[in-house]
Design a protein with these regions (language model features):
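A composition/biophysics-driven feature that prefers long, compositionally simple stretches
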Residues: 1-186
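Active-site cores enriched in adjacent His and Asp/Glu residues with nearby glycine-rich loops
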Residues: 15-31, 177-226
Length: 226
């Protein structure tokens, strides 16, 4: 499914083009803990990869043929002991179907070379300011590497990706239906559970529990319990 999505994106990019999309990153809650991680929807759409600090790069050559790259957190026994399994660059290829996998710390030295020679570079301009600045710096460096890249266009990928995401496959529609069923049941259960003198925190905890009970890690939207 994700490979087909990358192929669909490549067909819209045209020849000699690149697309860059970043994952979400962990957000610190305090010095030793982070908030629950939820992957960026655009990044997930193209990769199915649920780790932070990662980058998808899709590149087309002069014929429009696709090459896919995934920059991921490196394998680290100590970190994996505490935070869970990491796929690593090899897993990006073997488990997620990317043509090439790299450690994320190689992005700054690798990506400008991949962009060199492209006519167009697409990214979600202004969506994540820090990443947008990194992409701009990579484009500038790519221009210095290849005189043919001097006229490179840096374009917003939002309209392109949104046009694909609006059209749902049968499997996506089924997931949405399942999500609606879980949401409806959670609301019904919360209404049956509520009682006089119950505080909002208890009701919210029960409501979120019902999502987890039926197989959903998160609700579709953060609930307002008042």
């Amino acid at each position: 499914m994700f490979t087909k999505r990358r192929e669909a994106v490549a067909s819209l990019l045209g020849p000699d083009a690149c697309l860059l999309v970043a994952s979400n990153n962990h957000v610190s809650r305090n010095i030793h803990h982070t908030y629950s991680f939820r992957q960026d929807s655009y990044f997930w759409y193209l990769s199915g990869f649920n780790e932070s600090d990662s980058i998808v790069l899709i590149k087309t050559d002069k014929t429009g043929s696709l090459s896919s790259y995934l920059f991921v957190p490196p394998k680290d026994e100590h970190s994996e002991l505490w935070d869970g399994y990491r796929a690593g660059p090899q897993g990006a290829q073997n488990d997620y179907g990317f043509d090439h996998g790299f450690n994320n710390f190689d992005a700054d030295k690798t990506i400008p070379g991949l962009l060199a020679g492209a006519n167009k570079v697409f990214s979600l301009i202004g969506y994540k300011e820090d990443f947008s600045q990194r992409v701009s710096s990579w484009v500038k460096e790519a221009r210095l590497k290849d005189r043919h890249t001097a006229a490179i266009e840096h374009l917003d990928a939002g309209p392109l990706l949104s046009s694909l995401r609006r059209v749902k496959s049968d499997s996506e529609i089924e997931i949405m239906r399942k999500g609606c069923e879980i949401s409806a049941q959670a609301h019904k259960s919360a209404m049956q559970f509520v009682a006089p003198d119950m505080n909002e925190q208890s009701l919210e905890a029960y409501y979120l529990y019902k999502f987890a009970e039926h197989g959903s890690r998160f609700p579709a939207y953060t609930p307002i319990v008042a």
